[in-house]
């Protein structure tokens, strides 16, 4: 069983998301520790990027704040490496294709892969392949190698359609990293097709559009989850996009194997800044309990 699937063995999984470097990396580390200590089963880490197309205003603004702090992809890798020395729960990156393509090539723009490596180092990595040190590789291979070296268990790429996943999946698989599929409301055939190749868990998108807090979630999520389970009985399903309240978490916990919350957490961080860790820890505990209320009652 993969490390990510293990996260779904402790009742209904609660999966929080944060943008790394907002308001700063030290606070990010404190928040991650607080979430882990208060029941988070898996944590999604957003790498700051200048064009996060799947994100709504709340997470877009968090990316802007992190980039103003000059946070690079390598800074995030170093943070994960430090956290991994004390935390055993699965850690998953949520990022974008350009961050990966540009990693280590020396051509990164702001928020697209970090400070990069000298051109001659990138050339050595390109020639050395899997035998080269992680820091000497570039592009998909370099990113995957460094992520594995730092202790990342999975990756979510919201701007990469299913038809293009094979450009990434074999490389990440080689380094023991699950490429997690997202399934939005779509045809039954497409849901089954995506589910059949899913790794780690399936991220079921509650609503079409970008991330953000929603008052009402009207999609027939039960039917979507049922289709996923029919196509791939072994893969856990977690629902995200729009979940913010304990009541919503309880409702989603009745349907799926896990609940994902991002914008509601990032919004609190944007308001509280360096005072956020304690509040986010308490919120994590509340949402984990709510996600499992129906499960425990059963």
Features from the language model and the residues they span:
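Glycine-rich phosphate-binding active-site loops on the catalytic face of alpha/beta enzymes
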Residues: 45-50, 155-156, 161-164, 206-213, ...
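N-terminal amphipathic alpha-helix/helix-capping segment at the start of soluble metabolic enzymes
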Residues: 1-17, 80
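Active-site-adjacent beta->alpha loops and helix N-cap segments on the catalytic face
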Residues: 2-5, 51-57, 71-78, 138, ...
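Active-site beta->alpha loop and helix N-cap motifs at the rims of alpha/beta catalytic domains
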Residues: 47-49, 61-108, 136-157
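Conserved anion-binding
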Residues: 98-100, 106, 139-216
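Alpha/beta catalytic cores of nucleotide-metabolism and tRNA/nucleoside-modifying enzymes
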Residues: 227-235, 244-250, 254-298
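Short beta-strand/loop segments at the ligand-binding rim of alpha/beta enzyme cores
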Residues: 11-15, 87-96, 172-182, 230-240
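Catalytic cores of alpha/beta
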Residues: 28-33, 187-195, 243-259
């Amino acid at each position: 069983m993969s490390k990510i699937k293990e996260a779904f063995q402790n009742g209904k999984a609660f999966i929080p998301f944060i943008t790394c470097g907002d308001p700063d990396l030290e606070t990010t580390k404190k928040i991650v520790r607080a979430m882990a200590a208060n029941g988070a089963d898996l944590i999604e880490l957003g790498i700051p990027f200048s064009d996060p197309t799947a994100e709504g205003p709340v997470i877009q603004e968090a990316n802007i704040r992190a980039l103003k702090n000059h946070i690079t992809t390598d800074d995030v890798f170093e943070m994960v490496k430090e956290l991994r020395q004390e935390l055993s729960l699965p850690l998953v990156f949520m990022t974008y294709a350009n961050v990966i393509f540009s990693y280590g090539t020396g051509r990164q723009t702001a928020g697209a892969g970090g400070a990069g490596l000298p051109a001659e180092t990138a050339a050595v990595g390109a020639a050395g392949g899997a035998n080269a040190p992680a820091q000497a590789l570039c592009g998909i291979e370099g990113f995957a190698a460094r992520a594995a070296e730092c202790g990342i268990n999975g990756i979510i790429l919201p701007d990469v359609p299913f038809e293009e996943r094979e450009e990434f999946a074999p490389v990440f698989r080689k380094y023991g990293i699950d490429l997690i599929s997202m399934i939005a409301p779509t045809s039954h055939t497409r849901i089954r097709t995506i589910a059949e190749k899913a790794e780690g868990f399936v991220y079921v998108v509650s609503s079409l559009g970008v991330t953000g807090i929603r008052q009402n979630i009207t999609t027939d999520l039960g039917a979507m989850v049922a289709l996923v389970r029919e196509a791939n009985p072994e893969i856990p399903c977690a629902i995200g996009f729009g979940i913010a309240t304990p009541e919503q978490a309880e409702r989603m916990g009745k349907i799926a194997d896990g609940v994902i919350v991002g914008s509601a957490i990032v919004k609190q961080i944007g308001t509280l800044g360096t005072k956020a860790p304690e509040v986010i820890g308490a919120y994590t505990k509340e949402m984990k309990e709510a996600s499992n209320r129906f499960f425990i009652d059963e």
